[in-house]
Amino acid sequence: MESCMESKKQGQISIIMPVYNGVSWIGECIESILQQTDTNWELLVLDDHSTDGTTELVLKLAEEDSRIFPILRQRNGVSAARNEGLEKAQGEFVMFVDADDKLDPQMLSVLRAMLGQTESDLAVCDYYRWNGKPDGIYNRSEGLLKTD
């Protein structure tokens, strides 16, 4: 019998992105994933029956890059979408993003390097929050997990 790890794509990162009516920002999010220096990933976009053009945009982007997999679903909410993404993910590692996130181009490379240095089952990273003002105010997250 094949083990779960043998059926997964060794080293690949599955990025799971639930979305509902995110056409205003999902393009920037996907573009930030496409710009990653680490290219061993798949993107599962779980569209919760969007009505604003999100579906069409994701389908177009999937035609342009074979690593993008649109999953069109009935509207069941973000938690159900994430769970479905976990079921369909083919990568050895899983990462969750929201449609309004933007990743630094080195994000996956740094994540992979850190996972390679440890035997960790979970990685948490800092993030910056932009409040939408033209001058861009960012707040760094700190102290989410304690190691002692």
Walk through the language-model features, giving the residues of each.
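Nucleotide-sugar donor-binding/catalytic module of glycosyltransferases
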Residues: 2-148
